[in-house]
Amino acid sequence: MHWADVIAEKLIEERKADKYIVASGITPSGHIHVGNARETLTADAIYKGLINKGVEAELIFIADTYDPLRKLYPFLPKEFEQYIGMPLSEIPCPEGCCESYAEHFLRPYLESLDDLGVELTTYRADENYKKGLYDEKIKIALDNREKIMEILNKFRANPLPDDWWPINIVCENCGKLKTKVIKYDSEKEEITYRCEICGFENTVKPYKGRAKLPWRVDWPARWSIFNVTIEPMGKDHAAAGGSYDTGVLIAKEIYNYIPPKKVVYEWIQLKVGDKAIPMSSSKGVVFAVKDWTNIAHPEILRFLLLRSKPTKHIDFDLKKIPDLVDEYDRLEDFYFNNKDKDELSEEEQEKIRIYELSTPKIPETKPFVIPYRFCSIIAQLTYDEEKEDINMERVFEILRRNNYSIDDIDEFSMKKLKDRLLMARNWALKYGEKLVIISEDEAKEIYEKLKDKQKEWIKYFAEKLKTAEFDALNLHELIYQTAKELGLNPRDAFQASYMILLGKKYGPKLGAFLATLGKDFVIRRYSLFE
């Protein structure tokens, strides 16, 4: 059984509810990356697991748009220093294209979630506060200040100061959340505050967006507002004494609410060179979710994040995207070959379920696919710079030479193929190896430096090419056959070929590569050396 189904089953056993609310959230303080997506996709998998069990469920997403800007991040201009301490929703867009700072980073992520097949209800914290959703919770927190302090102090090395209050007023003068409570009148429900930034003082009701609860109180408050029953969280929140532990006590003792079941997930680290570094928006170590569909289909990201338990650490290496896509293609193959079988082992059932959870829209029949690496080569050779598009006629010529049957490709597969070609080209140019065929003059120079036996083979192979069946399988066999006839190690034949084509000793699978380059070009290249 897939881990999401196991979690859903346990939740139903442990907690009876008319409707199960699965929550996820993010603070849009910077580019929202693949590491952040693990939380949302974990929540989505659990939600789908609940639906699969036949219960009513909803997936909600709460964007912490009312959190303050905490510092000047590396990607921000110097002038944004003036906004430190202001709620993200009240700060201008850093590029002038959105209504606020928060929306600038949030909107692309929400659009990406739509591409990823995630259906959810989105709430923005600034709107929640301004609509008064938190008003009752704020009143309860203020009236129970000492109890909340007692709970928080249980997990603190240094106790909170006696004048601490579970509220942050938004200064009416400078708009910052750096204020100090001077007095609270419970009967009038008014707070007198002083801004620690500009010195402004006033007395206000802390409602309708005039104030915000601190995180450790805000979180349990929202659980009770939205009736949250389960929520994935990073290991920092779930650590002993972390915000989940304090949230559990505040939910029970202050808000009289049964806290949600926690699902802890591990970080995703981005491979940079030989190092794996935890993704961090604030440090600029990110691969934004919005950039994913430039290099691969959404289901590949879902597969990456949902095939393993949330507690499993993931190292994300952009150079290995082709391997990841190949794994998904094999899984898709398995799904369509086995989905209708009556008897499957537990492992086989789990593979079927991984495919179902990874693929937002499962096609009726198995799509026609070309391996991603091969697509990256074809796309670079068939891209029309003038039209800024793939020349599909040339693609089909190459596929025929590579023994692909393309007569019955359906419309869905055709679109998917073209998308993959464009994505694979983007990947190759940015993260893989750009395919550069060296010039004839360069090839001649390299030829002179080859071993005599390699030179002899190139000329012999050139003659054989003129009458050869020009497809990948025949060319592959011809390389081995001609090398054997001349007593040359096939490895030396391959290296010689790569050298006169690419200027290096390695490259794509040679038979397929030669078929892809085409008969005229290949014969001309191997015949240069008279």
Curated annotation (Swiss-Prot):
Alphabetical list of PROSITE patterns matching this protein: AA_TRNA_LIGASE_I (PS00178)
Keywords noted in UniProt: Aminoacyl-tRNA synthetase, ATP-binding, Cytoplasm, Ligase, Nucleotide-binding, Protein biosynthesis
Primary localization class, coarse: cytoplasm
Any single biological process term in GO: lysyl-tRNA aminoacylation
Origin: domain of life: Archaea
Similarity field: Belongs to the class-I aminoacyl-tRNA synthetase family.
Protein name: Lysine--tRNA ligase
UniProt organism field: Methanocaldococcus jannaschii (strain ATCC 43067 / DSM 2661 / JAL-1 / JCM 10045 / NBRC 100440) (Methanococcus jannaschii)
